[in-house]
Amino acid sequence: MPQCFTIMNNDNNHNTIQEFDVNLICDFFLNTNRQGPGSPEATLKALSFINNLTVQSLIADLGCGTGGQTMVLAQHTPGSITGLDFFPEFIECFNRNAEKLNLQDRVKGVVGSMDALSFEKESLDLIWSEGAIYNIGFERGLNEWRNYLRSEEH
């Protein structure tokens, strides 16, 4: 059965309700390297501003999709990476991609929602969300997710 969402818009006195099958999104993006804008070069440029990651570092990639940027991160950082995405089909592909690159020992994908994280507070060394934070709003994401980062004393 298709998973459907109802979107309600209320702008300028025009109320609309639209239903769409989110499986269309999965089908469209499943076989692409990335589910949004970006490139390996853009990922590496952003990563160049991050210091002090170690083999003990815990990294989360929120809204990871099939893991295009996550695999680039894994190939250029130590530590463990958990990719989180709402779509199970993306996570299945994510885990296959990690296995193909022999990264499965430190890179795993899990199904979840970026607005209800299952990580413990102050447990992560880095939160990555390349082109996905807009799903819950940039300001909201920054405000909520910072609680999951380790304090600077750790």
Predicted segment positions?
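N-terminal, positively charged/glycine-rich alpha-helical extensions of SAM-dependent methyltransferases
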Residues: 2-27
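Class I SAM-dependent methyltransferase Rossmann-like catalytic core
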Residues: 25-38
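Conserved alpha-helix/loop element of class I SAM-dependent methyltransferases that forms part
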Residues: 36-55
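A short beta-strand submotif of the Rossmann-like class I SAM-dependent methyltransferase core
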Residues: 129
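A short, conserved alpha-helix within the catalytic core of class I
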Residues: 135-145
